[in-house]
Amino acid sequence: PAIAPSVFTASGHLGGSYSEIASTAVEHALSKNLTLTATYLFAGGVRLPRTVNVNMLPPVLLTASNAMQLGIAQPAPQQIGRPVFPPERLARQFDGIYQWQNQAHSTYNGLSLALRRRLANDIEFSANYTLSKAIDDASDFDEQPQNPYALRKERALSANDQRQRFVFSGTFDLPFGDEDEPGATRKQHSLATDVFGNIEVAPILTIGSGRPVDPLLGFDGNRNGAFPLSSRPLGFARNSLETPGQAEFDLRVLKFFLIGGHGKLDLVAESFNVLNHTNVTALNPVFGPSLEPIPTFATPNRAGIGRQMQFSIDFEF
């Protein structure tokens, strides 16, 4: 028999997506140059986009006795006992009718603590810690539900959720020599001053918890026709896996030399992920067709960039 075509369409009830945001903050001056700030932020996403196949008949619980009637000659162990969609369609001239809808929602709740020191005595820094939780029922416009008749079961941690995050950044001048600008009178220099003087160090340390990953069977187990695939292993909810925590240390070092009375030469060295720490950014989400997962299920399969270094020379006159 001929294969019916699939079409993409838009819902007739589309409306504009929008956000509802509320925040409050308290700031306290610990000293002349040091402040502590606590901030709470709520953000709700309303009428967010997602894709739903609206041409499916209601699913039927698959058993060994009705598998042939549902067009599945040899059901996989992961298919037995789960709702499976019949091969017939509501509109028979089409296979899938993938409708772009904006009925998804999201919520974000976050508490941030920030300790900031403004520039004084050649030192400034900022330390920020955030504890947050992001929940939604679709994290992207092309994300399809496992069961179009049970959209509420898609509500889970967002793919963008990161429960904890800490960032420290600062600028420090090494305590050697002076920071005279071109044209100023230079002081007498020792060997330590010549080597370590006029050096500015700017570190950035980022530490964060892992991010959710959606477990998948790796095939269209419930016959919903979704692509990207959305059939999950039995007993697993949406985005129920999590990558390991991440840590990255970046460093920028600048040393300048005064040239003549009005010139300055900057030598800059920058390194990203100085410690060459492996930051896992993705896991293999494929569980496989059996009741036991394949060996590589939930193992790392992608990582962030390794150590990178770059150098530059700037001349000011």
Segments and roles (model prediction):
Residues 1-317:
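Short, solvent-exposed micro-motifs at the edges of structured domains
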